[in-house]
Design a protein with these regions (language model features):
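Juxtamembrane intracellular "pre-TM" segments in multi-pass secondary transporters
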Residues: 187-221
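C-terminal transmembrane helical hairpin of 12-TM major facilitator-type secondary transporters
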Residues: 281-325
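Helix-to-loop junctions at the C-terminal end of transmembrane segments
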Residues: 51-64, 266-280, 364
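Central cavity-lining transmembrane alpha-helices of secondary-active solute carriers
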Residues: 39-57, 257-269
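Hydrophobic core of transmembrane alpha-helices in multi-pass small-molecule transporters
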Residues: 91-107, 306-320
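Cytoplasmic helix-loop-helix junction between adjacent transmembrane helices
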Residues: 98-136
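Short amphipathic helix-loop junctions that connect adjacent transmembrane helices
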Residues: 10-35, 235-251
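C-terminal ends and interior cores of transmembrane alpha-helices
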Residues: 74-89, 290-302
């Protein structure tokens, strides 16, 4: 997620609203095309993740996990080299391709989690999974800080803006060495099952299968709406603070880093306690309200540090909502189906985020960034009213 979270502070002033001619990835294009391309460049990552994750997971179950992890890290290295070159020469299509490759390689996250579970005792599985969750939330605020540290916001040289991508490529190259030489060749439980036929449309078929179950469908509707709305908020808010508040790249990076810190503490401290005390369904409903109210408040109360405060509330809200829904999803199915259900939820998240990010480009093009944020607030609040009351299975 560090690689994903550096994108918004960089693309807002180079694609959505270029600050100068030298930092324009679509020179001489219309304002509408700039914003549509901005949404497409953001949205392609989670959409590729949606299609890749089930396929990569199936390959790892049927063959071995280590080769796929190596391929994913190598692919991530190449994707950031490609994005760096595209940013250096201000070329949109190669940048878009690099984003797509990054999304495809991120589909290995589930394989990494499976590898950890294969090689740890049963009583420590929850602990190891929590490590992956914390790592993801750390990436949310490390990415923007990484971009802010490496880019001079006053520079008009494209090479300066490409440095974070080359830096990330170097990080992945360093990671690749211990993965190749020190990661055990085969996890303990890999290859235990009979090989199954690879299904290239597994993600879509899993979604269709879950949609046939009434309770899963009832939960998935607000889950999709809120995550799509938040994707729209993420992309629109980067443009809005640049235009309306005059933020430069470094200030946009700080803005999103604050959200990442809020997400980190929400996952680690507040969410488990709130869910335990009030129940996942209540927490999910009211976290959607928190997102809507914080977004409206940001549009109205712009003084001083208040936008940063509302950004923190927004990220806390989406973190609470996501974790609560995951808890509900896992309680709607039997223990034997929970792994499948959580993979479906992850796919739903990727698809919803991708649609929201792409939609933000359309809204910014024809209405403005303000409209994208209003869209987020309205649909987050709407989700409160349609959130279902569900009967969960007993925990085993």
């Amino acid at each position: 997620l560090a690689g994903e979270s550096i994108i918004l502070p960089i693309l807002a002033p180079t694609l959505a609203e270029p600050v100068c001619d030298k930092l324009d990835m679509l020179a001489n294009a219309s304002k509408q095309l700039h914003n549509l391309a901005y949404g497409a460049a953001l949205g392609v990552f989670p959409v590729c993740l949606f299609f890749a994750a089930p396929i990569i997971g199936s390959l790892s179950d049927n063959y071995a996990r280590k080769p796929l992890i190596i391929a994913a890290v190598a692919g991530a290295f190449l994707s950031y080299i490609l994005q760096g070159l595209a940013m250096q020469y201000m070329l949109f299509l190669p940048f878009f391709a690099g984003r797509a490759v990054a999304g495809l390689t991120t589909g290995v996250d589930g394989v990494i989690q499976a590898y950890l579970l294969d090689n740890c005792p049963a009583e420590k599985r929850a602990k190891y999974l929590s490590y992956t969750l914390f790592a993801m939330s750390i990436g949310l605020f490390v990415g923007p800080m990484f971009a802010a540290a490496l880019i001079d916001p006053h520079s008009t040289e494209p090479l300066s803006w490409s440095v974070p991508f080359y830096g990330l490529a170097a990080v992945f190259l360093v990671i690749l060495i211990p993965v190749i030489y020190f990661l055990p060749k085969r996890s303990k439980n890999a290859l235990a099952n009979k090989k199954t036929k690879l299904d290239w449309l597994a993600g879509i078929k899993d979604l269709k299968s879950s949609w046939r179950e009434v309770d899963l469908r009832k939960l998935s509707i607000p889950f999709i709406i809120v995550n799509a709305a938040f994707g729209c908020y993420m992309a629109s808010s980067a443009v809005w603070v640049e235009k309306s508040l005059g933020f430069n790249m470094r200030e946009i990076s700080l803005f999103f880093s604050v959200g990442g810190v809020a997400s980190f503490f929400t996952y680690g401290l507040f969410a488990p306690k709130l869910i335990g005390k009030f129940g996942a369904q209540n927490v999910a409903k009211y976290s959607a309200v928190l997102i809507g109210v914080a977004t409206f408040a940001m549009l109205v109360l712009r003084m001083g540090a208040l936008p940063y405060v509302f950004m923190a509330f927004n990220f806390a809200g989406i973190s609470l909502f996501y974790l609560s829904c995951i808890d509900i999803y896992s309680g709607l199915v039997s223990a034997q189906r929970r792994g499948w259900m959580l993979s479906v939820a992850s796919s739903l998240w990727g698809l919803a985020q991708g649609l929201g990010l792409a939609l933000s480009g359309f809204i910014c093009a024809y209405i403005g960034a303000f409209g994208g944020m209003v869209f987020c607030a309205i649909f987050a609040l709407f989700s409160y009213y349609i959130f279902p009351k569900l009967t969960l299975k007993e925990r085993d």
